[in-house]
Amino acid sequence: TGVQADVAVYFPDNISKLYQLTQWLPVFENHPNDLTFAIVIRNIHTFNFLQGKTSLPLAHVPNFSDVMNLYRVSPFKAVVYVNNGVANFQSLTVPELAHIHINHGESDKVCMVSNQAKAYDRVFVAGEAAVQRHRAALSEFNVDLLVRVGRPQLDEHPSPSISESSRTTV
């Protein structure tokens, strides 16, 4: 059966990379527009770990054929990617959907400006510095595909991960 959402957030990786997704969950859960999101997970351990940790629907699709079937029967209009995992390229085979790379942060690391950016319909970046990094590092890359969005996950105000204490934190 399909998942009722406008946007699929594709995450094929194991729990060790879950930080790449979890920083975006509040943004997807509290999206200011009427867009709805669902998390598409390939790894069963990641799927089990996320149960009850998000209000978004979760879909476990372990195999390529499962991913293709989910995309076929769901009303998704776009797929969002939070990293450059090699398994993203299986999801990218669906031409009817818009494929958007949002990454999990920005830095001067090579992976922030790899040729993988050319595979996506749009690449969301924090700002002009990211645009300049792409322009300088990639040949034959259309910087018009870069969309400046800031860092929306920083607009969320998560609860502190450490309990309140009278002790000084350094």
Q: Would you name each region that the model predicts?
A:
Residues 13-14, 43, 83-85, 126-129, ...:
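Helix N-cap/beta->alpha junction signal
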Residues 1-71:
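N-terminal pre-catalytic "stem/leader" segment of glycosyltransferase-like enzymes
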Residues 28-31, 90-96, 114-119, 140-141, ...:
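Short, conserved loop/helix-junction motifs that constitute active-site signature segments
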Residues 116-170:
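A nucleotide-sugar donor-handling region in carbohydrate enzymes
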Residues 45-116:
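Extended catalytic core of nucleotide-activated donor transferases of GT-like folds
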Residues 2-7, 95-97, 164-170:
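A short, charged/proline- and glycine-enriched loop
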Residues 33-37, 77, 118-123:
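Short active-site oxyanion
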Residues 1-5, 12-15, 104, 149-159:
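Short N-terminal or domain-adjacent regulatory/targeting segments
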